[in-house]
Amino acid sequence: MKIKTRFAPSPTGYLHVGGARTALYSWLFARNHGGEFVLRIEDTDLERSTPEAIEAIMDGMNWLSLEWDEGPYYQTKRFDRYNAVIDQMLEEGTAYKCYCSKERLEALREEQMAKGEKPRYDGRCRHSHEHHADDEPCVVRFANPQEGSVVFDDQIRGPIEFSNQELDDLIIRRTDGSPTYNFCVVVDDWDMEITHVIRGEDHINNTPRQINILKALKAPVPVYAHVSMINGDDGKKLSKRHGAVSVMQYRDDGYLPEALLNYLVRLGWSHGDQEIFTREEMIKYFTLNAVSKSASAFNTDKLLWLNHHYINALPPEYVATHLQWHIEQENIDTRNGPQLADLVKLLGERCKTLKEMAQSCRYFYEDFAEFDADAAKKHLRPVARQPLEVVRDKLAAITDWTAENVHHAIQATADELEVGMGKVGMPLRVAVTGAGQSPALDVTVHAIGRTRSIERINKALAFIAERENQQ
């Protein structure tokens, strides 16, 4: 049997991390079994579904490189198929037309609740033989079995049973002729030959209804697996108050897709005590029986740690392709300065996100208007004038411009003036970067370049001279 899974989001908003984890688990299960992964857009909620949300879902899936083998399919383009199946069910007696008014249904609901009963349709039209005009408004209901129970072996939670007496005859077609969500899902899974449905635990109550419809259609019933929810670190359901929840917001905040995928796969699944997984390892090791039944807590600090790891572990050239977007957001012109791959090597240890990297690299490419006030006050003092002049001249005299030779020039300056490296290094750092912190000074000066470094040292010397004149 060919394994076939699906990810079926509703395009009413962005792709959130819970949906992304579900998509990842479905994708991994299919890839682990050499199967196929289908993308289906469940856009039957015409009022809330938007083209922007569809685009956001696609963007998130593409950014995470969760490529699909079929689709995207759109439910709104399959209404003829759904209605044909409903008409067939009406003929076979597994569905019936319901003419009950909203007023009657509301009164029935209030009466049942007053008795402490679970609100459910009482089946009045199921057994009615009244004649109705063809154009009289009605819904179509599924004739749910009235006896027995539905049992399915959830691949994460084990056997789950629902009594058919708990399930009422759900509406499968509205008065406007549009099919309902639970019915469309069933026909889609049947037509698309889905073998395994991996989805959130909020769908557990839909499962027995969908199984009963599948059986009425004499269609194969897929295997179900319901993934637990994701909570914030406070134990409450993950929401915007916990920070970013949109996949693309994590991109915007400077995370690598590898970091988010690695974090999401471990958010409810484990393979021994391994923390770092390549995509190939995820595919190789992923199984549903290793997915936890318990809710997972989202920990941003752990995700940040993973992101820092991947910034430094992945090839700098690859990281640079993602950094480029953030550089563009900061409007930094990188034509005059180090290659972005070299920048990743320079700043990787210091920066936990690509956004932080982009925001802290401007001095490599553009001259700054002024020095950081605190750093200048501390290090660009008259006592720094001679070390800066000497190191400037030694940098200018370097014939082979390498980081190693820059280091020798700084060391030679300290030796010549008989001062510690800090007496040369700190004023030089403030002079060439404008601030008191940077990567190792030799590689920083080397990356900034000889001409620009000397110009900035001269600017710092002018700043010191002006400061002397003001005293």
Curated annotation (Swiss-Prot):
Cofactor(s) needed for function: Zn(2+)
Entry-linked InterPro entries: aa-tRNA-synth_I_cd-bd (IPR045462), aa-tRNA-synth_I_codon-bd_sub2 (IPR020751), aa-tRNA-synth_I_CS (IPR001412), aa_tRNA-synth_I_cd-bd_sf (IPR008925), Glu-tRNA-ligase_bac/mito (IPR004527), Glu/Gln-tRNA-synth (IPR000924), Glu/Gln-tRNA-synth_Ib_cat-dom (IPR020058), GluQ/Sye (IPR049940)
Keywords: Aminoacyl-tRNA synthetase, ATP-binding, Cytoplasm, Ligase, Metal-binding, Nucleotide-binding, Protein biosynthesis, Zinc
Pfam families: Anticodon_2, tRNA-synt_1c
Main location: cytoplasm
GO BP term, example: glutamyl-tRNA aminoacylation
SUPFAM superfamilies: An anticodon-binding domain of class I aminoacyl-tRNA synthetases, Nucleotidylyl transferase
Main EC class the enzyme belongs to: ligase
Motif ('HIGH' region): 9-19
Chain positions of motif 'KMSKS' region: 237-241
Details of cofactor binding: Binds 1 zinc ion per subunit.
Binding-site positions, Zn(2+): 98, 100, 125, 127
GO molecular function terms attached to this record: ATP binding; glutamate-tRNA ligase activity; tRNA binding; zinc ion binding
Catalytic activity: tRNA(Glu) + L-glutamate + ATP = L-glutamyl-tRNA(Glu) + AMP + diphosphate
GO cellular component: cytosol
Domain of life (superkingdom): Bacteria
EC number(s) given by UniProt: 6.1.1.17
Binding site for ATP: 240
Transmembrane portions of the chain: none
Family: Belongs to the class-I aminoacyl-tRNA synthetase family. Glutamate--tRNA ligase type 1 subfamily.
Function of the protein: Catalyzes the attachment of glutamate to tRNA(Glu) in a two-step reaction: glutamate is first activated by ATP to form Glu-AMP and then transferred to the acceptor end of tRNA(Glu).
PANTHER family assigned: GLUTAMATE--TRNA LIGASE (PTHR43311), GLUTAMATE--TRNA LIGASE, MITOCHONDRIAL-RELATED (PTHR43311:SF2)
Quaternary structure note: Monomer.
Listed name of the protein: Glutamate--tRNA ligase
Species in which this protein is naturally found: Shigella boydii serotype 18 (strain CDC 3083-94 / BS512)
Phylogenetic lineage: Bacteria, Pseudomonadati, Pseudomonadota, Gammaproteobacteria, Enterobacterales
